A protein has these predicted regions:
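Ordered, amphipathic secondary-structure segments that act as subunit-interaction surfaces
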Residues: 75, 80-93
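Short, internal active-site loops enriched in acidic
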Residues: 94-99
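Helix-start/capping segments and mature chain N-termini
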Residues: 1-80, 102-279
């Protein structure tokens, strides 16, 4: 099976699932989501993804009736039905209503889940990045479906033959369109602190934990575009890409001064997923 989906009790192929036009994610982007990778009935970093998902739903006041263990069981059931051995899992909770009104105070919620096959590369090539001014609003720490600025920049990056775009806010690097970004400098890793300017990435947190375990000092502080361009190494982290080096920004060669250390961290992140798959 190439893809699988679920919506409020419906199970089936993506093209067979029907979503009502009253779903507020369509008109207002009134929804939160999360995404993970997995293998058969097991979801990588499952607990952290579900915790973030439920926290964001609560922050937006989206009402739901399931508990964490119930959502976990449902996601695993859907994964088993998909029969995919390695997949990208997307799950979304929207505030639904029967007519198009802005207020959603008394609305119930709808759960959408999709699964698609994915291949996680063991030794991917370094990334090419572009930079752009961060013009987003101040809710970047909530994983909502309002992704237009990220979509526009990701499209621009692809048009320029690049893999990702880096947001820069008043000279300060925040994050990428679908990833977190960190730099290695003089044996330290530097990454933007958690705030309403960035998504608290799960892969980001695992990378920082690995740095601490092997003796790399972790600095969670803002860093500038100039620091980015002159860093010893640049690391991009996400749920699906795990950890990747970047070697080009805006057409200029960057990093490359600590390749062994950067590769060690990338390999540690990949090994975690590989070990997860064979358990």
């Amino acid at each position: 099976m190439n893809s699988y989906a679920y919506y409020n009790g419906q199970f089936g192929k993506r093209e067979d699932i029907l979503i009502p036009l009253s779903d507020r994610s369509i008109f207002f982007g009134d929804a939160v989501y999360d995404a993970a990778i997995g293998s058969y009935d097991r979801i990588h970093w499952e607990s952290e993804h579900i915790d973030r998902f439920l926290l964001n739903a609560n922050r937006l006041g989206i009402k739901h009736t399931f508990k964490k263990n119930e959502l976990s069981s449902l996601l695993r059931e859907i994964a088993v039905k998909s029969m995919l051995d390695c997949y990208f899992l997307y799950f979304q909770l929207s505030r639904k209503t029967l007519c198009r009104v802005h207020s959603g105070l008394d609305a119930s919620s709808s759960l959408l889940v999709t699964l698609d096959p994915i291949k996680i590369e063991e030794s991917p090539s370094p990334l090419k990045l572009i930079t752009a001014e961060d013009l987003r609003y101040s809710y970047c720490d909530i994983k909502t479906v309002n992704l237009l600025p990220a979509v526009l920049l990701a499209t621009e990056a692809e048009a320029k033959g690049c893999d990702e775009a880096v947001f820069v806010k008043n000279g300060i690097v925040t994050e990428c369109t679908k990833s977190n970004i960190s730099i290695l400098n003089r044996g330290r890793i530097i990454t933007h602190p958690k705030s309403n300017r960035i998504l608290p990435g799960i892969a980001r947190e695992h990378l920082l934990d690995k740095c601490r375990k092997i003796g790399i000092k972790v600095l969670e502080r803002p860093f500038t575009k100039e620091e980015l361009l002159t860093a010893d190494e640049i690391l991009v982290t996400s749920t699906t890409k795990l950890c990747r080096r970047a070697h080009t920004i805006d057409g200029k060669t960057v990093g490359g001064k600590e390749p062994a250390l950067a590769e060690e961290l990338c390999n540690l992140m990949y090994e975690d997923f590989a070990n997860f798959c064979i358990k």
